[in-house]
Swiss-Prot record:
Pfam families cross-referenced by the UniProt entry: DD_K (PF12121), FSAP_sig_propep (PF03032)
Function: Possesses a potent antimicrobial activity against Gram-positive and Gram-negative bacteria. Probably acts by disturbing membrane functions with its amphipathic structure.
Originating species: Phyllomedusa bicolor (Two-colored leaf frog)
Protein name (record): Dermaseptin-B3
Family classification: Belongs to the frog skin active peptide (FSAP) family. Dermaseptin subfamily.
Protein's cellular compartments: Secreted
Assigned keywords, A-Z: Amphibian defense peptide, Antibiotic, Antimicrobial, Cleavage on pair of basic residues, Secreted, Signal
Summary of the tissues where the protein is detected: Expressed by the skin glands.
Propeptide, residue positions: 23-43
Signal peptide feature range: 1-22
GO CC annotation terms, alphabetical: extracellular region
Keyword Cytoplasm attributed: no
Any one GO biological process: defense response to bacterium
Length: 74
């Protein structure tokens, strides 16, 4: 009977250890996925920022050109 108890406790202990290891790996994978998502969103933000900056420059140049033609026409 004592041998059976020890075996059951050993099986339960090993099961808990393996379960905790699996949970830890799962948390690590979730953290890695979150970091990848953060990196992708930062890249998208930088892309939009650069695109808007370029549009702003073009709009400024167009406005400056229009003002120069109006001043030159007078």
């Amino acid at each position: 009977m004592a041998f059976l108890k020890k075996s059951v406790f050993l099986v339960l202990f090993l099961g808990l250890v393996s379960l905790s290891i699996c949970e830890e790996e799962k948390r690590e994978e979730e953290n890695e996925e979150k970091q990848e998502d953060d990196e992708q969103s930062e890249e998208k933000r930088a892309l939009w920022k650069n695109m808007l900056k370029g549009i702003g420059k073009l709009a400024g140049q167009a406005a400056l050109g229009a003002v120069k033609t109006l001043v030159g026409a007078e």
